[in-house]
């Protein structure tokens, strides 16, 4: 997210001509206030559910010494120390909620080595990690390999006493900072399963203040074993969910369509277990966006956004990632339709969230205020060449330079509490952003356009006559409602209509367009199409379903942006012109801002040099809704 330097506008001013009591007024309350008395009174909350502190072994090896308490303080707007020695702080508004998600694997093992009260204080591995020689990256990685070997032998370095102590401290920090109605501190952790550098990671989030004595880690079993564990917790009265992330680095292992991790054939039971425990996926974070890949969706002009090209967990491996199918959210949504046709259950009916995956106890969401995980210089992160390079032609761009800023999770919740946020996630009334705070609403229904026309409160009418993002529509509803809308592709068959609504982040760029991304099955084959449904300056072309370029510009001399292009609000009702009542389908909204400078360009500007030619100078920040599904 890039700060434009403009004064923050009251959200009530954003909904041009919006009826009193509707969206604009409703979101002005932010995260404070009492519980919603009706679904239409739900508020948009922004948070991060992927933060690492010193209790994660990789963060600790990166000289991070900040704690969960620091993470919550940062989220609430306070300054905390960065490993570089600098002080870091949000330049915009505080977050509404946060989850510290330290790795369950070797949880707290490294801080315990230098804690005099720990049973592993003075362990032989300590010298390897903290001696002068151990300061080198290779030595630290060697020590990490040794840590894994020791853990496999039952060495107390990864014993239950060490892990339970760290876990308890994480829970206690969440309890200290949880402030219902004002700020929510969720209890969570990361399950970090890797197969040869390929990620099948998950974050686990708990609904309340109850949590098990120890988190379930990848050392305890594969993701299916994790779901069994979550099912067992639920039976014991402890509700939790998992959300996959970094799917873009999984080589297709994130979303298999035929074979489980145990080598068995995927069946309906497996599919049901997965979607029961994993209702949402993290599709935007600093290690890349996992919405879509250009090779999977070549007709999507906006697919090339924060695409990570290299594996992160293979030292000195510069081979690019080459397997994309099974590693991106839209592809999984399409695969889910095919699997539902075959199995009767869709394991990939996934909502969307974003988060940061920060390893310094603080998410970096702002393009002009970005900080790295360890060293915090432009030269180290590839946005500036070193003096000895003499220019870009002699500079090797590190693979991490393609990383972005952190994403954010948005939810429409009854109030700012653990239970309300968790419930929004389970019903998939959630959305993701690339770090900007665009508010997105999305409703679908048969006859919805007529039902909300002229309504005093369109949101209330949309809840009454349709479903919000994350919901399901069926052919039986179409027949019951007798909706009048029709589409050319289906003759007289009723087609669903959708309410698409987005409000600009008042401290970021103006909105350029809102799109509906549709996926469906046609003769058993998955298809997709992107429709521009509302433009900031003009109307979509009815033939191409595209908005004209609105002409918004970025001045690379100072990163200033066009002030006369774009919209503060985008709102429309849209009816699918190509609806086939016999085809399984899904729809989700993607909202694009006008172009702004990427973080690497801001870095170059601060040093008075040209931006790195190997990186995008500008990009379009965005938001994604969770889908609405249609079942024939």
Where are these regions (language model features)?
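Low-complexity, serine/threonine/proline-enriched polar segments
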Residues: 125-152, 541, 558-559
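The substrate-binding groove and active-site-proximal loops of carbohydrate-active enzymes
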Residues: 57-62, 150-164, 207-220, 318-327
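Long, well-ordered early-domain segments
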Residues: 105, 138-184, 198
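Bacterial signal peptide processing site
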Residues: 17-20
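C-terminal functional module detector
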Residues: 24-68, 72, 82-122, 159, ...
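Bacterial N-terminal signal peptides that target proteins for export
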Residues: 1-6
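Enzymes and membrane/adaptor proteins characterized by extended Gly/Ser/Thr/Asp/Glu-rich
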Residues: 51-61, 125-128, 144-151, 199-214
């Amino acid at each position: 997210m890039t700060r434009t330097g403009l004064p923050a506008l009251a959200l009530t001013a954003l909904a041009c001509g919006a009826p009193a009591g509707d969206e604009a007024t409703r979101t002005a309350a932010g995260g404070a206030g009492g519980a919603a008395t009706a679904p239409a009174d739900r508020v948009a909350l922004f948070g991060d559910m992927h933060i690492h502190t010193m209790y994660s072994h990789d963060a600790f090896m990166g000289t991070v010494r900040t704690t969960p308490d620091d993470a919550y303080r940062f989220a609430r707007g306070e300054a905390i120390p960065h490993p570089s020695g600098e002080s870091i702080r949000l330049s915009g508004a505080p977050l509404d909620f946060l989850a510290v998600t330290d790795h369950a694997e070797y949880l707290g093992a490294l801080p315990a080595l230098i804690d005099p009260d720990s049973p592993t204080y003075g362990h032989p591995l300590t010298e390897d990690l903290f001696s002068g020689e151990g300061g080198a990256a290779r030595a630290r990685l060697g020590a990490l390999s040794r840590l894994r070997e020791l853990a496999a032998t039952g060495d107390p370095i990864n014993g239950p006493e060490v892990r339970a102590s760290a876990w308890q401290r994480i829970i206690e920090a969440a309890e200290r900072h949880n402030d219902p109605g004002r700020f929510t501190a969720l209890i969570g952790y990361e399950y970090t399963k890797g197969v040869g550098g390929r990620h099948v990671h998950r974050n686990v989030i708990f609904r309340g203040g109850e949590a098990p004595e120890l988190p379930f880690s990848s050392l305890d079993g594969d993701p299916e074993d994790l779901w069994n564990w979550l099912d067992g917790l639920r039976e014991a009265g402890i509700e939790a969910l998992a959300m996959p992330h970094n799917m873009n680095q999984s080589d297709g292992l994130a979303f298999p369509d035929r074979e489980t991790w145990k080598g068995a054939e995927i069946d309906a039971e497996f599919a049901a277990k997965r979607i029961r425990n994993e209702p949402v996926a993290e599709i935007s974070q600093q290690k890349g966006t996992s919405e879509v890949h250009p090779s999977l969706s070549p007709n999507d002009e906006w697919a090339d956004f924060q695409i990570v090209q290299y594996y992160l967990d293979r030292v000195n491996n510069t081979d690019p990632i080459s397997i994309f199918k099974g590693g991106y959210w839209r592809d999984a949504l399409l695969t889910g339709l095919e699997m539902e046709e075959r199995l009767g259950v869709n394991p990939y009916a996934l909502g969307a969230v974003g988060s940061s995956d920060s390893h310094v106890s603080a998410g970096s969401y702002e393009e002009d205020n970005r900080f790295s995980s360890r060293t915090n210089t432009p030269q180290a992160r590839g946005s500036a060449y070193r003096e000895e390079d003499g220019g870009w032609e002699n500079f090797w761009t590190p693979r991490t330079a393609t990383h972005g800023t952190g994403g954010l999770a948005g939810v429409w919740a009854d109030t700012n509490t653990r239970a309300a946020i968790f419930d929004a996630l389970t019903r998939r009334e959630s959305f993701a952003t690339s770090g900007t705070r665009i508010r997105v609403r999305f409703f679908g229904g048969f006859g919805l356009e007529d039902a909300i026309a002229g309504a005093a409160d369109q949101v209330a009418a949309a809840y009454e006559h349709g479903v919000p993002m994350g919901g399901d529509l069926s052919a039986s509803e179409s027949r019951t409602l007798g909706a009048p809308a029709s589409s050319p592709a289906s003759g007289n068959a009723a087609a669903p209509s959708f309410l698409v609504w987005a409000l600009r982040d008042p401290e970021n760029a103006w909105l350029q367009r809102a799109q509906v991304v549709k996926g469906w099955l046609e003769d058993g084959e998955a298809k997709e199409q992107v429709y521009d449904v509302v433009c900031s300056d003009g109307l979509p072309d009815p033939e191409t379903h595209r908005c004209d370029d609105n002409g918004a510009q970025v001045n690379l001399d100072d990163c200033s942006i066009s002030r006369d292009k774009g919209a503060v609000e985008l709102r429309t009702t849209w009816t699918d012109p190509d609806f086939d009542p016999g085809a399984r389908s899904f729809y989700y909204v993607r909202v694009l801002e006008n172009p702004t400078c990427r973080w690497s360009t801001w870095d170059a500007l601060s040093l008075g040099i040209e931006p790195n030619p190997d990186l995008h100078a500008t990009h379009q920040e965005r938001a994604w809704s969770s889908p609405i599904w249609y079942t024939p």
